[in-house]
Swiss-Prot record:
Signal sequence range: none
CDD domains in UniProt: TPP_PK (cd02011)
Organism from which the protein derives: Streptomyces coelicolor (strain ATCC BAA-471 / A3(2) / M145)
Single biological process term from Gene Ontology: carbohydrate metabolic process
Database matches in InterPro entries: Phosphoketolase (IPR023962), THDP-binding (IPR029061), Transketo_C/PFOR_II (IPR009014), Xul5P/Fru6P_PKetolase (IPR005593), Xul5P/Fru6P_PKetolase_C (IPR018969), Xul5P/Fru6P_PKetolase_CS (IPR019790), Xul5P/Fru6P_PKetolase_N (IPR018970), Xul5P/Fru6P_PKetolase_ThDP_BS (IPR019789)
Family according to the record: Belongs to the XFP family.
GO MF annotation terms: aldehyde-lyase activity; magnesium ion binding
Pfam family of the protein (one): XFP_C
Cofactors demanded by this protein: thiamine diphosphate
Name this protein carries in UniProt: Probable phosphoketolase
Amino acid sequence: MSVDTQQAPPEPTDEELAGLDAHWRAANYLAVGQIYLMANPLLTDPLRPEHVKPRLLGHWGTSPGLNLVHTHLNRVIKARDLDALCVWGPGHGGPAVLANAWLEGSYTETYPDITRDAAGMARLFKQFSFPGGVPSHVAPETPGSIHEGGELGYALSHAYGAAFDHPDLVVACVIGDGEAETGPLATSWHSNKFLDPVHDGAVLPILHLNGYKIANPTVLARLPETELDELLRGYGHDPVHVTGDDPAAVHRATARAMDTALDRIAAIQRAAREEGATGRPRWPMIVLRTPKGWTGPAEVDGLPVENTWRAHQVPLSAVRTNPEHLAQLERWLRSYRPEELFDDAGAPRPAVLAAIPEGPRRLGATPYANGGLLLRELPVPPLEKYAVPVGEPGASTHEPTRVLGDLLRDVMAATTDRRDFRLVGPDETASNRLQAVYAATGKAWQERTLPVDEDLDRHGRVMEILSEHTCQGWLEGYLLTGRHGLFSCYEAFVHIVDSMVNQHVKWLRVTRRLPWRAPIASLNYLLTSHVWRQDHNGFSHQEPGFVDHILNKSPEAVRVYLPPDANTLLSVADHALRSRDYVNVIVAGKQPCFDWLTMDQAKAHCARGAGIWDWAGTEDGSREPDVVLACAGDVPTLEILAAAQLIRHHLPELAVRVVNVVDIARLLPSGEHPHGMSDFEYDGLFTADKPVIFAYHGYPWLIHRLAYRRTGHAHLHVRGYKEIGTTTTPFDMVVGNDLDRYRLVMDVIDRVPGLAVRAAAVRQRMEDARQRHHDWIREHGVDLPEVADWTWEAPR
């Protein structure tokens, strides 16, 4: 249900505030217990060293603040009957979020052995950061989580991604003041310029200033309040402040701040949805300033702890061996008065549970945090409508991504009412030839517009901001809450999100073994404007290594595709858009490219992942080939086919096999990757003992790494990108990296037995062609006519 001021509750009574405090104290008690205890959860016996874990792990400092936020979110969710989700940026405060899930019952529903009684509490405590237990952060194992928060910077972009196209959802986002110093977080404040108050939900940022990181003060906590206010207002927010260290006063102030913020959200949404307001609203946020490690030990060993950086992790570190630490821990735990919070059986008392919402309204049970439950099949139209006609291989050209743009346009159109598909990118949609989508939807934009602007749309579903971090964060949040999307990016600059994709793959790998986590739509990358066609921008834009990075990740969760033409791109994209729980990387060109395969051939080839192009080679089946010319990627495919044509002309007696690889993981052994080939398959395709000249899109050593255990690896010779780049002609890029057709012919002559002497004159002609290229481009500034005007001639 959307926020509505008619549902705004009155200020909480003293009795209700006492109940909120009881809930907060219970959550704090449970958080401390998880960090320290493995037995005696209710302190029914005096605390002894054997009750304490031998290895103390976890983070206390942020936990009381997270517990405060969770407690007060419970109140407003229940009072206003809200659909809500919370993104916990300080994910190292896992004990707090786990404590609240246990209190509300969602944890027991997910893990029935962790019962809401003394025995279940003991198991909850022992399992935390314990071998065979649960991680220390707000990991995928945590009900209600879409954001682990281990690597900082992405909380707010995840929150906005969750809110897009969920008009009835309120996403609270706790931002630690340490995380607020990261670059991705700093940029993601601008997400409010893209939030549509008509079709999207609301994000309520809660900036938690507890003052310290691991060992240093935080920047924002030390700013004067007026300067901090100016900063946040400059970001487009309307901050509401809560400051204090007295629990009763802070509870009252937090309740008031939550109501104020939600009332403002309701007014913004009502103005946009009912009154037609179109100006960019100033969304509320809460600035919460409470002590780090609040309610914990004030001093330890004579040094201040509470409200200092020393409270960050484990304030009492020698509890098993230091009697004073043990006594201090017991006093700390008993300060929460657990006998008031839990009955004799260990169940939470009614006062603790009074403010907790029911059923799926609970933060740990919301279906929005288990997005696969909400996911619908994406209506991808039949590919035949978009297929380019191919009478003969290489007889025509198309721009592959432009062809894909037509498909994406119609996916956008088919989801107009559903609003569950988005395209994100860092100001590159048109550059990457996908602008056909603008016929179905515009670019999301809530700022003012000028007459020169094009395709801006307050209700658009194309998201463009020049921050790869924010693009990925938006898309991850969108996918994790049950929708579909595609991230289009220049190949060289997708490396900016290397670390983000690490975290997403880890998330997917864990969720695959959690039966209660429903599969989500895959994270799909379209990498274009790639290394071989960045001759105009130069060396800085030439970097094909993202594929290497991805293939280091969990094999069950990553896929890499290098379609060689428009129809194979359509087939790969169709597969990726329909898939679940993967990271799919598609590398494709946007420049005119020869059309090699019909749609039916493309589908079959992509299903195989790698195959012989018999129409391109000269083997007739009467004997094994003399050489295998292999390729992966659009430009390497062009150069391999041009080399095959040269060989056919100059060395017609050679039996040449041409192999194209579209799914690069096929090169791996089947035991190492689900898409890998058996040794029998590999040897059948590449032979066991014949030279293989492999033209690869990226760094050549990746192919060696993938195939190093194969029988014929000693005969494998790979050409690819060798970090030779500049602003030059397209063909000069491949010549500089020894990937050109002439070099490939020379490689064949050098590696097929008997050719070194017999074909020496041919080799010399290839060398001469490379020199002629060198001289020509330096005089004319363009490639040789024999290269620029080259066409494929079918074997006779």
